[in-house]
Structures are given as C-alpha cells and as structure tokens.
Amino acid sequence: MPRIALDLNREADRQKVKGQWRLGPGLVPGEPNEGLVAQILNTPARLAEYDDSKWEICNNIRQSISKGFTFAWYRIAVTLPAEIDGVALTDSRVYFETNVDNYGEIWVNGKIDRATGVIIGINTQYRVEVMNKAVPGSKHIIACLVVNGPLAEPVGGIFMRYATLAFESRN
C-alpha cells in the first residue's frame, strides 16, 4: 500500500495542503479564566466553523508552551491536493496522526471519534481518519485539544510531538 506522509510541522509540507497551525490557549480561548468553569458542557473551539483567525500562528508545534495545569487548542485547515510529488491522491484514505503531551482530543470537521480521537497518556500514538476517499479540493479542519497532566500535579508544558497527514493508496 503506497503511502505519502506530510509532516505538518514543516512549512514545505503544510504548503502542499495550504495549511497553517493556529494556537489558542485555554479550554475556550479568549474567555475569562481560559474558559475553565465548573460543569462546562462543551467548547466551541472544537467546531469546524469556529473562528480562530485571531489566534496566534504556530510555526513549531513541538515547542513546549506554558506550565502547570494548562489547556490549548492547535487547529489547522487543510485542503487536499490532487497529487503530491506526482502521485495522484484521489480515492486515497486520509489519516491524521499525532502524539501530544499529555492528554488530548482530535476533532475532524467538528466531530470526534471517541474510540480513536481521545489521547490518554504521554507518548501514545494516535491516528484518526480524515476522509475514507480523498476528494481533491476538499477542505478539512483538524482541531486538537491538548492538556497538561497529571491534573492534580502537572509537570512540564504542552506540545504536539508530531502531526502527520497521511495518504494511503488502495492499490
């Protein structure tokens, strides 16, 4: 099965899908106390139509940010190309693969697959389907919530170890 993998931390690879990472601190970026309130039912940052245009641009998802009990969202919009390096991508399976420190959630187009989109634990690799059959020109929003842990005594900061957009041919 031929595979093409783009490292979404590399500018050259992000350009192939017209992507740019944005970083929004907090569970609900821009809200008082970063949106941390008792019994919150959801956060709009997970939704595809959420406006992240005022968030800072993040050119290095591997850079550790913050300290202590922290939440942040990493979001990227990608547009699937017809080909990469001469290889046609139509009908390929498309996956987003990542590893975050410590807990995370992966939302694709405003939805989460609770079986594959919840990251529990440091150094755990995760892979979620973006699209079963690639359609050139289709746009997808990938939103990753990252949380530092353990929650009662967090150490270090938050970051994404890697983020890959993979295209796997059916042939």
Each model region followed by its residue ranges:
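Surface-exposed, low-complexity/disordered Ser/Thr/Gly/Pro/Asn-rich loops and linkers
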Residues: 48, 52-67
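Flexible loop/turn segments at secondary-structure boundaries
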Residues: 102-105, 114, 149-152
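Solvent-exposed beta-strand/loop surfaces of large extracellular or lumenal domains
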Residues: 107-128
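Beta-strand-rich interaction surfaces with strong enrichment in secreted/lumenal proteins
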Residues: 61-68, 75-77, 85, 115-118, ...
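Aromatic-lined ligand-binding clefts that engage carbohydrates, nucleic acids, or primary amines
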Residues: 47, 55, 70, 78, ...
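Surface-exposed coil/turn segments at beta-strand junctions on protein surfaces, enriched
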Residues: 69, 89, 121-123, 134-137
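An acidic-aromatic loop/edge-strand motif
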Residues: 1-47, 55-57, 134-171
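Short, flexible loop/turn elements at secondary-structure junctions
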Residues: 82, 100-102, 120, 132-134, ...
